[in-house]
Amino acid sequence: MKSKQTISLAVASMMAAGLLAGCGSTASSTASSAAESTAASSEAASSEAAAPADTTAAGKVYYLNFKPEQDEAWQALAKTYTEETGVPVTVVTAASGQYETTLMSEMAKSDAPTLFQVNGPVGLANWKDYCYDLSGTKIAGDLTSDTYALKDGDQMLGIGYVIESYGLITNKTLLEKAGYTVDDIKSFDNLKKVAEDITARKDELGFSAFTSAGMDGSSDWRYKTHLANLPIYFEYQEDGIDNTDAIKGTYLDNYKNIFDLYINNSTCDPAELAGKTGDDSRNEFLNDEAVFFQNGSWEYTNLVGDGKPFTDDDLTMLPIYIGVGDEANQGLCTGTENYWCVNKEASEDDINATLDFMYWCVSSDEGTKAMANDMGFVIPFKNAVESPNVFVKADKEMTAAGKTPVAWNFSTMPSENWKNGVGSALTAYAAGTGSWDDVVTAFVDGWASEAALNAAA
């Protein structure tokens, strides 16, 4: 088992090698924002209870949350749990794109997280020595299917706690103002025709086709990870595999076509994308500046609700078409990269407190309603409340109609370093300072080199 000192040394060496930094000039700023987020969330976190309810745990919970967009909801839910049970719950939220960095740093401390998450098999490989075996726990027994369990041999080391979808969030009202409906978009060619027509009439219409494809650390994951999933998925489908140490790049021309469509038909010049943020993209969509916004079901509460400009009737989500496969029967990109893991190095009391908190979140009225209504989650547990999320409903409707969801194969990407290399190449390509060949090199050669490093570790 690795020691705290070993983790500290690993953090230092990985950061020195640039393995955990954001791409381009964003590394220092995103690392700084991660620290600020951690400090702010810690300060806002646990609350002492006045009248504890029944609980078997005498310990405390420290949850290192992956999702900044759900921070407020997690803080509120933690407070409710503490008020009901008397068990202190601290929620710390890492800044966007900085989870692994923050996790490495926090796990090196004496008061390390008791609850953290990994993104799938690749993430588990890095952290399995710290993961408590969840086999036989109450939360494991509440799963609707073992397919949501992350296993290493006979041990259940992670549990998927949310199923999500991503695609093209679409403002139906603006689309109709441009003379189209969602029924007009069933393929890449359809999407290209609509987007380029909107661009040609941009001054007349008063809006663009796509929000800015921001490539700073708060936004580039949408393209170096989520958009990159599409060519990986279709290559895996063609080759009949679910993982590889040597991606071929069969569909990288299609990746180029969709990325070109985004950056050449958006709210800003492609050369400006290096400095554009996730907030920029969201605000453009909120302000009716664009029809399409590539993002996921987790964005629902940022767009709909009190003080928000949209209702469910205004929005839907379309598949990300790249011109491959049976597009008429393609669904949204649906899956999970969110697996809860319990720190087995925590005290027995803290482990038990954490297990109780996890089970309460997915089984109690307060927990399940908060996860469905406040966070917009679909959770794979027996007591799940149906989510009001319009994007979740879109996924269900497509699946019921026989459309095939695109699997989340990005959990097989070899490393964060690989993602950052692809992100840097995409940013340079958009700015005109790099070529698409550089993207292909980062994608294919970078994959092979990172996979080799993993094999040698």
Features from the language model and the residues they span:
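Conserved N-terminal structural module of periplasmic/extracytoplasmic solute-binding proteins
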Residues: 8-9, 24-123, 139, 274, ...
